From Swiss-Prot:
Motif annotated as 'HIGH' region, chain positions: 11-21
Subunit annotation: Homodimer.
Lineage: Archaea, Methanobacteriati, Methanobacteriota, Methanomada group, Methanobacteria
Family statement drawn from the similarity comment of this UniProt entry: Belongs to the class-I aminoacyl-tRNA synthetase family. MetG type 1 subfamily.
Keywords of this entry: Aminoacyl-tRNA synthetase, ATP-binding, Cytoplasm, Ligase, Metal-binding, Nucleotide-binding, Protein biosynthesis, RNA-binding, tRNA-binding, Zinc
Positions annotated to bind ATP: 328
Main location: cytoplasm
Name listed for the protein in its UniProt record: Methionine--tRNA ligase
Annotated gene: metG
Chemical reaction(s) catalysed: tRNA(Met) + L-methionine + ATP = L-methionyl-tRNA(Met) + AMP + diphosphate
Biological source species: Methanothermobacter thermautotrophicus (strain ATCC 29096 / DSM 1053 / JCM 10044 / NBRC 100330 / Delta H)
């Protein structure tokens, strides 16, 4: 029996969960935790709500509440969402807990004492009326990229770009509306650059999935820069050094430790040592938007402290909605609680698992959800189980009949049942959740074919022994389907095992004794009606109708052309921005693009792109930008113009 430490990325407590959160992080992590428990491993599965940072503080001021009141409200919502989805945490705590503050401050102090944290002055926006510095979302203004008003100090909803407060044009304090000034502020930095070689060696020697490994190596190629570790605000974990009143540890300097504080809280309750689990190798489940933090920054902090680094990092890619990027601000999203008001949690766990491999972006479509539930769960899995149980009840008095002499076809069918647990286990060990679940569905499909080929409705009259053997093997498959589905669809699996009067045993092939009582059962899965799907789609359309439209004249003012990147380099002081020299046919232009998290400069040189060439020039980090490179989605995939000639206008 091995000890296993499994974590989920901490959900941020400024809103409830939506399907994107569940798909990328919580459902796959729970599948893996349940699987390892069934294998007999000693699992510690932890999480917490991340309750510090500017978004919560800003929301609290806007609502006339304290940040703790806002965080508490959403902590309870998030906890409820995850419990209703059968996420089986051993510990789910909060970063506002006293224990978390204590652990985070001790961690900070040790790094400071070891010389890995130093002080440096930086320039920040300061509101004279409020008499405070304005980090992140405490400031808004005009986006320098797309010109959208109301862009926040960390993000523009208009174009999706990451921003820094000093980049905003016409910045305003979010609280009082006054224009801030630029002042120097002293902050603490972590010597991330010092761990460049150690991080590279760790990543290259790890078993991380390619999407995590490649992303991290791309950053390492560019060289790591020291990381600011503090913020000027009151809400958060206070810097534990004298003379630093009003300074907190940056959320990415303490939120990681929510894994540790949640485990430590579990230790206090159980009397068991969480360190034994951590030292066995932690497995982090996260969304791909925080790969950098977990694959670069977090292991460097652990190396500096002297702790073991994670054993693996599993990053789920993005989920879009009906072909469009999800947006909570525009309500283009399916909230977990809304989904569960109408549909069963197992349908959610099933669809978000089989929709696509975890390492690939995918889309949630109501039509596809209906199709897969109806075709795969109702018509394949549910149909096989219902036929087997009903036939057993009708012709064998509700008891598993004896198996007679086995034919070659019977033996082949039996072997597929015997091998299933090993096949699914091998896939789950590789974190291939979709393939593992689809193997189970294919096994149920094979069961339907076997049932049809054997024609037990005829055999029960013409050859009772043949019908008895067929139903014995079909019940054997049903029992093992129930066992196999436990990590993926625990509620449905429990119903199958209950119908068959079976115990929740360890992972592995399950023999079935003759005479086992099979209870009368209704179909496990009902088909989803067209009306139900149309109602859900209508909710999105109602919201979409509010989107502001533009005329063809508006569109024709935009000069979008095919270009080719002649040179690319990083911009000093920014982790997101690249300076590009782009050939657009008649001339070369300089563009600052927020592509550094996705692409290295070397990857972009001589690459054809589409670029908006008549954008009003702006300065970003002191570098002039004359246009905008077009890319899609949160993943910032550059639009490929194909065979179009450089300089051609896109119409």
């Amino acid at each position: 029996m091995s000890k296993v430490f499994i974590t989920c990325a901490l959900p941020y407590a400024n809103g409830p969960t939506h399907l994107g959160h569940l798909r990328s992080t919580y459902i796959p992590a729970d599948i893996y935790a349940r699987y390892r428990r069934l294998r007999g491993d000693d699992v510690l599965f932890v999480c917490a709500t991340d309750e510090h940072g500017t978004p919560i503080a800003v929301k609290a001021e806007a609502e006339g509440r304290t940040p703790l009141e806002v965080a508490t409200r959403y902590h309870e919502m998030i906890r409820g969402d995850l419990e209703r989805c059968d996420i089986s945490f051993d510990s789910f705590t909060r970063t506002t807990d006293e224990l978390h503050h204590e652990i985070a401050q001790k961690f900070f102090l040790k790094l400071y004492e070891k010389g890995f944290i130093y002080e440096k002055d930086i320039k920040q926006l300061y509101c004279g009326d409020c008499q405070r510095f304005l980090p992140d979302r405490y400031v808004e203004g005009t986006c320098p990229y797309c010109g959208s008003e109301g862009a926040r100090g960390d993000h523009c909803e208009g174009c999706g770009r990451h921003l820094e407060p000093l980049q905003l044009e016409d910045p305003r304090c979010m609280v009082c509306g006054s224009e801030p000034e630029v002042r120097d502020s002293r902050h603490y930095f972590f010597r991330l650059n010092q761990f460049q070689d150690e991080i590279r060696e760790w990543i290259e020697g790890s078993e991380m999935p390619s999407n995590v490994r490649n992303y991290a190596i791309q950053w390492l190629r560019e060289g790591l820069k020291d990381w600011i570790l503090t913020r000027d605000m009151e809400w958060g974990v206070q810097v534990p050094l004298e003379g630093n009143e009003g300074k907190i540890i940056y959320v990415w300097g303490e939120a990681f430790l929510g894994y540790i504080s949640s485990a430590a809280a579990w230790s206090k309750k159980t009397g068991r040592d969480w360190r034994e689990y951590w030292d066995s190798g932690a497995i982090h489940f996260i969304g791909k938007d925080i790969i950098y933090h977990h694959a670069i920054f977090w292991p460097a902090l652990l190396m500096a402290y002297g702790c073991r680094t994670p054993a693996n990092i599993i990053a789920g890619e993005y989920l879009s909605l009906e072909g469009q990027k999800m947006s909570t601000s525009k309500n283009w999203v399916v909230w977990t609680s809304d989904f569960l008001e109408r549909f069963d949690r197992d349908l959610l766990r099933y669809y978000l698992t089989v929709n696509a491999p975890l390492t690939r972006d995918t889309d949630f479509s109501w039509d596809d959800f209906q199709r897969r539930v109806n075709d795969e769960l109702a018509d394949v899995l549910g149909n096989f189980l219902h036929r087997t149980f009903s036939f057993t009840g009708r012709f064998f008095d509700g008891r598993v009949p004896a198996a007679g002499e086995l034919t070659a076809e019977d033996l082949e069918f039996l072997e597929s049942i015997r091998a299933a647990h090993d096949t699914v286990a091998e896939l789950l060990d590789k974190f291939q959740f979709r393939d593992a679940l689809m193997h189970i569905i294919k096994l149920a499909k094979r069961g339907n074919k076997y049932f049809n080929d054997q024609e037990p409705w005829k055999a029960v009259k013409e050859s009772p022994a043949r019908a008895s053997t067929c139903l014995h093997l079909c019940n054997l498959l049903a029992a093992n389907l129930g066992k196999l589905l436990r990590p993926f669809m625990p509620s449905a699996a429990g119903r199958i095992l209950s119908i068959m009067n079976l115990e929740d045993e360890a992972w592995g092939f399950h023999e079935l004794r003759e005479g086992q009582v099979i209870e009368r059962a209704k179909p496990l899965f009902s088909k989803i009606t067209d009306e139900a799907i149309e109602e859900e789609k209508a909710k999105l359309i109602e919201e979409d109708d509010e989107v502001e439209t533009v005329t063809i004249d508006d569109f024709t003012t935009m000069d979008i052309r095919v270009g080719v990147i002649r040179s690319a380099e990083r911009i000093e002081g920014s982790d997101k921005l690249l300076k590009l020299i782009i050939d657009v046919g008649e001339r070369e232009m300089q563009v600052v693009a927020g592509l550094a998290e996705k692409y290295s400069p070397e990857d972009l040189v001589e690459r054809k792109i589409t670029v908006l060439v008549n954008l009003k020039p702006a300065k970003l980090f002191g570098v002039k930008s004359e246009g905008m490179v077009l890319a899609t989605g949160e993943s910032l995939n550059i639009l490929d113009p194909g065979d179009a000639e450089v300089g051609e206008r896109i119409r």
